[in-house]
Swiss-Prot record:
A GO biological-process term: tRNA pseudouridine synthesis
UniProt EC number: 5.4.99.12
Role played: Formation of pseudouridine at positions 38, 39 and 40 in the anticodon stem and loop of transfer RNAs.
Organism per entry: Ehrlichia canis (strain Jake)
Gene Ontology MF terms in the entry: RNA binding; tRNA pseudouridine(38-40) synthase activity
Record's protein name: tRNA pseudouridine synthase A
HAMAP family: TruA (MF_00171)
Length: 245
């Protein structure tokens, strides 16, 4: 029986989603151990988006197979019991057919990056948003966003060790919602390059600091060179929001 699970986690204390050979405390490892404790079956979980260390999730989706046929609510409650005290929560469980794949069946992925623009240190949002102390011109950031939407070669916005075969991606939607000191940047696409969202955010922040005009964003894209773009924004402001199937 295949189970589709929707999970939420605070990524602050984890090394990321994926199991790593010589490191422990990945979300995948802890989740699979929790599944084993209630089912007595060793499983491999497959996920919609492999988040890096420090990145959070509001609606991550994964799937796994068990020989036993449990009610969905039993699976949810049992996994959550064995996840205590980790900051991971199973929000929903659905039984699905064997054709469903958390990664390959995805039609669109949605991310959020949270910035707090003020001078004072963060307390409530510590490790859950990027504190940017320099005043940001959000209007300029919004204008820069328009150059990034659509289909482009995003070589300037990919990590140097990115393993994706092609740097060409389509940014279906990219918008900024600004309220007082909070700047929320929403991204939607079928898939993303490694660190693409965080490098775009770092570049938008540089634009907001008046390091360059919004129009220069087009030049950054056309350069197809990582050195032209801004810094890679820290992981703790990034959230995997949801995935469409």
């Amino acid at each position: 029986m295949r189970y589709k699970i929707t999970i939420e986690y605070n990524g602050s204390n984890f090394i990321g989603w994926q199991r790593q050979k010589h490191l422990s405390n990945s979300i995948q490892e802890i989740l699979e151990e929790a599944i084993f404790k209630f089912s007595r079956e060793s499983v491999t979980t497959y996920v919609a988006g492999r988040t890096d260390a420090g990145v959070h999730a509001l609606g991550q989706v994964a799937h796994f197979d068990l020989t036993a046929d449990f009610d969905a609510y039993v699976v949810r409650n049992a996994i959550n019991y064995h996840l205590i005290p980790h900051s991971i929560s199973v929000l929903n469980v659905e039984k699905t057919d064997d054709e469903f794949h958390a990664r390959f069946s995805a039609k669109k992925r949605h991310y959020l990056y949270k910035i707090i623009n003020r001078y004072s240190p963060l307390t409530i949002d510590y490790n859950r948003a990027w504190l940017v102390r320099n005043p940001l011109d959000v209007e300029k950031m919004m204008r820069a966003v328009e150059y990034i939407k659509g289909n482009h070669d995003f070589s300037s916005f990919r990590a140097r060790h990115c393993q994706s075969k092609s740097p060409v991606k389509t940014m279906d939607d990219l918008k900024i919602i600004h309220s007082d000191q909070c700047i929320d940047i929403y991204f939607s696409a079928i898939s993303f390059l490694h660190n693409q969202v965080r490098i775009i955010v770092g570049t938008l922040v540089e634009c907001g600091k008046n390091s360059f005009p919004p129009e220069y964003t087009k030049d950054i894209l056309e350069a197809k060179d990582r050195s032209y773009a801004g810094m890679t924004a820290p992981p703790y402001g990034l959230y995997f929001v949801k995935v469409d199937y």
